[in-house]
């Protein structure tokens, strides 16, 4: 192998090692980009509350009738009440 081929191979190998893991676009993407605000509480099977350093409070709900996951607006009144009750329960225990 000549020196140019070896140098090129080393550079390519180095760039592969640096690109391991998730692409930058996936690392910083928040799970919720759109929020639903008019979903009745009775249509929700369960909620997941997500909070990451890169994203604001994210609330993901699974719907009863079709199992679809949607993101709920955390500013919705019934969600704020739900979160307040959940936090109060956690503080008491």
UniProtKB/Swiss-Prot annotation:
Region (Receptor binding): 48-50, 60-64
Amino acids binding heparin: 41-51, 62, 69, 85
Chain segments carrying region Receptor and heparin binding: 29-33
Chain coiled-coil ranges: none
Disulfide cysteine pairs (residue numbers): 30-55, 32-71
Keyword Magnesium recorded: no
Record-marked site positions (Important for dimer formation): 46
Biological process, per Gene Ontology: cell chemotaxis; defense response; G protein-coupled receptor signaling pathway; immune response; integrin activation; mesoderm migration involved in gastrulation
Chain positions of motif Receptor activation motif: 22-23
Pfam families in the record: IL8 (PF00048)
Signal peptide (UniProt feature, chain positions): 1-21
Domain of life: Eukaryota
Keywords carried by this UniProt record: Chemotaxis, Cytokine, Developmental protein, Disulfide bond, Gastrulation, Growth factor, Secreted, Signal
GO molecular function: chemokine activity; growth factor activity; integrin binding
Site note Important for integrin interaction and activation, residues: 45, 48, 64
Chain's role: Chemoattractant. Activates the C-X-C chemokine receptor cxcr4 to induce a rapid and transient rise in the level of intracellular calcium ions, and chemotaxis. Signaling with cxcr4 mediates the directional movement of mesodermal cells during gastrulation. Binds to the allosteric site (site 2) of integrins and activates them in a cxcr4-independent manner.
Quaternary state and interactors: Monomer or homodimer; in equilibrium. Dimer formation is induced by non acidic pH and the presence of multivalent anions, and by binding to cxcr4 or heparin.
Family: Belongs to the intercrine alpha (chemokine CxC) family.
Protein name, UniProt field: Stromal cell-derived factor 1
Gene: cxcl12
